[in-house]
């Protein structure tokens, strides 16, 4: 994956990459906008709001990661470890002393770090189906999804 990001960045002369995880069906554009705004105001080597990385407080599954292409180019020269090359940001997160890492603090109403909206298992798929049955749509924002979840289940489930 790292190589794909680098090739694409070079081909299109991209300065900054916003990475959304494919197992997140409830991507929230407003939370990605919040991340981009945060990144512009707080220049760093990596920022995120897609899960509770770096103690952001976010539920897993709404946001993204953002990283300058120049950092990806540097990582390419620093590691040949298969894991680092398969998972685009693993090297950065495992080497926090080398990079300026930041996270967007979750706003009130989204501060549920134990909630997980990823789809990785059959149980995750069942949860997705239940949320759709109770009213979540492609147009639902992150606040609506969390509120519908809490109204149905009354307490956050623990992450796996």
Functional labels for PLM-detected ranges:
Residues 9, 14-22:
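Short beta-strand-to-loop acidic/aromatic patch adjacent to the donor-nucleotide binding site
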Residues 115-118, 134-136:
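Short, flexible active-site recognition loops that position polar ligands and cofactors
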Residues 3-4, 27-115, 126, 130, ...:
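Conserved core of the sugar-phosphate nucleotidyltransferase
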Residues 2-10:
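Short, conserved alpha-helix that lines the donor NDP-sugar binding/gating region
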Residues 121:
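Short, conserved phosphate/pyrophosphate- and ester-handling motifs at nucleotide-, phospho-/glycolipid
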Residues 125-126, 135:
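Short, acidic Gly/Pro/Ser/Thr-rich loop/turn segments
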Residues 82, 135-140:
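Cytochrome P450 catalytic domain signature, combining two hallmark sequence patches
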